[in-house]
Amino acid sequence: MAADKVDPIHQFHIIKLVPINIGGYDLSFTNSALFMVATVVVAAAFLFLTTSSRSLVPGRLQSISEMAYEFVANMLRDAAGTQGMKFFPLVFSLFMFVLVANLLGLFPYFFTVTSHIIVTFGLAILVIGTVIVYGFMKHGLGFLKLFVPKGVPLVMMVLVVPIEVISFVSRPISLSVRLFANMLAGHITLKVFSGFVVSLSALGAVGVAGSILPLAMAVALTALELLVAFLQAYVFAVLTCMYLNDALHPSH
């Protein structure tokens, strides 16, 4: 148990809460699944409770909800134009899910679902899948113009087209790894400094004095992680908007 408290990786372990095995497939309900459900419930409850009154003079919480709505709406309009607003429910849902999941992960003993690559990759595949499906539905084979930039000489197409295809295919990887790596690294660093504080404090008066610097670093890192939680949600959402713009306007 003592090792678990110091081990910075222990916080990312998947724990089976309700073992479920169907046809040889492990479909157990885990701590990761629990906090994904909690993330959806918290985000939905916050938005419902803060906007249900629809007061002409909004309170603080209602103002936060309206600011989040306008923030994402403006982001989507800037990246994909007014046509992009048809994707607002998707982008806003992704933004709120990533933001709330990141924030919940900062609470002690809570699980950070966005620190697992399988979760972030699933979100990225949802985005890229939407781009591909909508792109072909709207433009047919014209969607393939996305891989043929305008103004490129014909002789260069042999080189440019494969590069564009590889760039497109790598999008879900870069989108998911960026979020996963930032959350993983931040939480490990925070856990390490917190472990220093606990370990030094157990050494008596000298240890307590020596723990002041790690404690200050832990507090500063916590504040930084709050900023990172928002920035990563913003980056994920803004890149989603840019990718959706390719589905709307595949011609460069």
Swiss-Prot record:
Family per similarity comment: Belongs to the ATPase A chain family.
Keywords of the record: ATP synthesis, Cell inner membrane, Cell membrane, CF(0), Hydrogen ion transport, Ion transport, Membrane, Transmembrane, Transmembrane helix, Transport
An annotated GO cellular component: proton-transporting ATP synthase complex
Subcellular location: Cell inner membrane
InterPro entries reported in the protein's UniProt record: ATP_synth_F0_asu (IPR000568), ATP_synth_F0_asu_AS (IPR023011), ATP_synth_F0_asu_bact/mt (IPR045083), F0_ATP_A_sf (IPR035908)
Membrane topology, as annotated: Multi-pass membrane protein
GO MF terms held by the record: proton-transporting ATP synthase activity, rotational mechanism
Main location: membrane
The encoding gene: atpB
Keyword Transmembrane: yes
Membrane-traversing stretches: 29-49, 87-107, 117-137, 146-166, 188-208, 211-231
Protein name as annotated: ATP synthase subunit a
Function recorded in the entry: Key component of the proton channel; it plays a direct role in the translocation of protons across the membrane.
The organism of origin for this protein: Mesorhizobium japonicum (strain LMG 29417 / CECT 9101 / MAFF 303099)
Highest taxon listed in the record's lineage: Bacteria
Keyword check for Transmembrane: yes
HAMAP family listed in its UniProt record: ATP_synth_a_bact
SUBUNIT field: F-type ATPases have 2 components, CF(1) - the catalytic core - and CF(0) - the membrane proton channel. CF(1) has five subunits: alpha(3), beta(3), gamma(1), delta(1), epsilon(1). CF(0) has three main subunits: a(1), b(2) and c(9-12). The alpha and beta chains form an alternating ring which encloses part of the gamma chain. CF(1) is attached to CF(0) by a central stalk formed by the gamma and epsilon chains, while a peripheral stalk is formed by the delta and b chains.
